[in-house]
Every structure is written in C-alpha cells, then in structure tokens.
C-alpha cells in the first residue's frame, strides 16, 4: 500500500441524508481541493490557515455540483498528521458520487478501509491501541463500552503499557551492560530492585488480563438466556424489557420455535437477551430443534434467567424443580436467576409458599410490569463494574489480551531465572521477548499483515 499519495472517501454513513462529509488526506489534498472549489470570498484556499472554514461551490468545469463548506487542516494539526480537507456537502447520493468521482479524476485515489486512521498511526498521531480504540468508539452502543473506548483512545491503556515497558527496558539495558563486562563479574542491575519491578509488572499484567473477562462482554454485550417451559411468558418478559413487540406472543404453547435475540442497556451496560424455545418433551421436529438450540444458547450465555408460571406452581412445582436441577447440574458455574412470572395472580399465602420452597426466587408479572426493575438490578449485580467506577483500565481487545498473556509468561520466566541465579545472557532473552509483546500492543513492533488485519475492520472513511 502507498502511504504518500492523496486519498478520498465518504466520512459519513453511505446513503442520502441532510449532509455528507467527504474527506481528503495527503500531501496534495489542499492543492487538489483548490482545483474544484471556488470560495464565495474569492480567497485562494492554498494560502489559508489551518482550522479554517470556507463557504463556496464545488465545480466541474463550468458546471456547479453543490454549495459546500470546506474545512482545512494542515500537516500535524490534522487527524491523519498530513494535509486534510473535509467537504461538507448536501447529502444526496448523486452529489456525493459526483464530487468523489471529480476528486478521483483530479489525482486522488479511493481510501482503503481504515486508511485515514492507519495514516494517523504511521504519522505518530496515536499508537496502535489508540487506533483500535477509534473503531471501538464508533461501534460502542452503551455507556460502559463508550467509557472504555474513550479511556483507551485518550491513552490510558497505552500509558500503562509504556510505563512498564520503559522501566523494564532500563533494567534490560543494565543487564546488557553486564554482558559487555562479563569478564569483570560486575552487577549493574540491582537484583532486589529488579525483583520488585518484576513483581509490580506481574501484578499489573494479571489485573489487565483479569479485566478482559468483564471488558469483552461489555464490548460485545452480556448474553442472557431466558429459558423455561413453553407459554410461561418468556416472550412477554423480553417484550417488556425491550418495550416493544419483538417476540411472538400467543396463547398457543410453543409459538417461539427458535431463539430470538435483542439488546438492552441497563445501568450503562449492554445486555443481549436471548428468548429461547421452551424446554419440554415434544415430538414436534421443528420445536425439538428449538429446544436443542436452547441448551446451546445457555452454554453461550453469561447469565441464565429461568422463568416459570408461578400461578401453576401447585400443579407443576415438582416438574419445575426437576428442570431447575437439570440446568444447575449441566451448567453449575452459570449465574442463575429464578423468576416466577404471573405473580399478580397469586394470593399472599401462595406467595409465601413459593418463597419457602424456592428462597432465591424473584416474583414478577411481565404483563403488568411488576418486579422488572428488580430483575434488572439482579442482572447488574453479576457484572463487576468496580473497575469502571474506579476508572481503571479494562481490556476489551482479544489481540491485546493475547499479547498480555504472552508478556506475563515471559516475565514469570525472568522471575524464575532471577530466583535460580540464571545467567544474565539467558535472562536477557526472556526480557527482550517480554519487551516485544509490550511493543506489539502499542505498535512499536508491527508488520504489514498485522496492520492489514486491524484496519480492515474499519469503515472506509475512517
């Protein structure tokens, strides 16, 4: 890929709208824009300052394509670190295409996915983890995911890694110095201080690695499986949570024959609710497939909500307990919320009887929207948001997680070497490898394949 030519792309979502923004970046961005833009003030945009806005027209020869606002960002003062022009035009798809085609004829080429942010990284405007956070910020759809992406984009994660890397690099330099003076048997690196540093690095790495369990589900939404027998109100509960008729609601048992999935933000955390087919013995082939999928979805979920008809507890209480035991035995580590629906039909005596039989039960009425807030609070209780509240770094990226695991392994090798008086030259190998994995996270160590994989996930105009 050539990184020194001038690229163009639509920066706003494709399709018609009130306005669209077309972004140009490269050494010749301002010159190319000046060939198609006529300012109403008559000013030459090649002579204007950075961060200025100009009203004018995009023209193709004598043909006026649109009246636009043109923004100028020069060199290192731009997002990409090179001359950048942003053209705000009317949102007609025809106008967008005409302007982009005109710019292509004038010497631009179409940007590849994520190329504007890639150039920002290559020009030192941000490191690799910050660049990845840009994509996370764009795709964030809840407060927690937004907060994590913003912190990472502002350098919170990068600074932690950079600090660890710098301290380790200082000791690595002293170890290398010892190797240069090996014949004199001199220790430049204080072993006690080195051990303290390794313990500190190990502690931070373990904290970051542990945070991935929370960060990954926050980024992608916490999957919650709603399970139970047919016609106990699973679809009604899902619709109540989502405030819309998302699932099929019918008096006919077994009408939800497949899994239905939707998202809801509770307390700033995204939850993916999966309304599954009911669990029961059946000869219906279609429904049997749905029941099989139910157990697959339970396996994939973080939390299981088991729902039953509390008004039928007298009749089906024993069968209910058997079903609960089956889920508990098959998924012993899954957080389980037991909900008795249709509680508005119960007397006080019946309520007390059910609570005696199942102390952990939460009684609700999905139809009447009673107890739904209690359910939301229980769901939140399963998410460790302490790190969020304390503004600690939370890892959400699988690539970062993998590099952290590898770095931790190397640090533990160095610790073992220190404890067993391993020769400095052998310890130096593990230290260099740990430094490599730190650099892999921030982009100090990269290759074309890695960059290609990362930026291919971006939209074209970013």
Swiss-Prot record:
One of its GO terms (molecular function) is metal ion binding. Residues 221-384 form the TrmE-type G domain. (6S)-5-formyl-5,6,7,8-tetrahydrofolate binds at residues 23, 86, 125, 462. Its main location: cytoplasm. Keywords: Cytoplasm, GTP-binding, Hydrolase, Magnesium, Metal-binding, Nucleotide-binding, Potassium, tRNA processing. It holds the Pfam family TrmE_N. Mg(2+) binds at residues 235, 256. Its EC number is 3.6.-.-. The keyword Nucleotide-binding applies. InterPro entries: G_TrmE (IPR031168), GTP-bd (IPR006073), GTP-bd_TrmE_N (IPR018948), GTPase_MnmE (IPR004520), MnmE_dom2 (IPR027368), MnmE_helical (IPR025867), P-loop_NTPase (IPR027417), Small_GTP-bd (IPR005225). K(+) binds at residues 231, 250, 252, 255. Binds 1 potassium ion per subunit. This is tRNA modification GTPase MnmE.
